[in-house]
Amino acid sequence: MNKSIITTIALSACLAFPMFADAQTFTGITAEQKAQNTPEGWPAVSLPQLPEITAANTFNIKDYGASTDAEDNTKAIQKALDAVPDAGGMVVIPEGTWMFGSEKEMTSTSEILSIKSKTILHLCAGATLKLAPYGTAPLKKVVYIGCKNKKQSDIVIEGEGETSIIDGQGARWWLAKEQKDTFDPGSMIRLEQGQRFLIRNLKIQNTPGVNITISNGGKASHATIHDVVISEPASEIGAGKASHNTDGIAIWGPYVNIYD
């Protein structure tokens, strides 16, 4: 299938957000519906059920105070995520590098960014969500990007290809591991409960720990992951440079479709 499938609405939001009045209906799961590859006799993996996306339910993090000059944008990004109505909507991360994840800016005790049901988190081309450095990000086990109150459904985390990046700045964490420092990094993306998740068309690199975790004891199901590049240094690269415990995709629930 073609990579970097970009819906008209997402492109409009990134490149011409002020002119969003003529936005089209979000139709971004058509390709996924055709690519499920479900074996005969098996139930298909369900895809997110999303509302029509318009200017009224699209939220750019810059409008909530996020800045590429800021040391931390956690609170601004969370405000945009919280602004999504119960009926659903989309949060846009524009081009640029956006720091997040310092412990002092956390708005939750267990998650840094919390996404609620029926939300699309869209990283534009050239957008990087970069985790705060070791010693500033929490050393205790937290979820960096997860579901609000753990149980949410119909969530999309997407980009526009390999220039849409989530960067964990893991090198200092890995060195600390070799130096026997005490810390317990969580997953970069953890969808713990609920159902109908879609992660696609982006790159995750240099995470302190696991890249993506689906479910906790079977409590989450129906996840689709495709065209996601996961990049971590190999363990054989040598002392001070190798990544540690950076599993790609940990699956602990049923009905998960991973391809390309």
List PLM regions with ranges.
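Internal metal/ion-chelating core segments
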Residues: 202-260
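Extracellular "leader-to-stem" segments immediately downstream of a signal peptide or signal-anchor
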Residues: 2-14, 19-120, 127-193, 198-200, ...
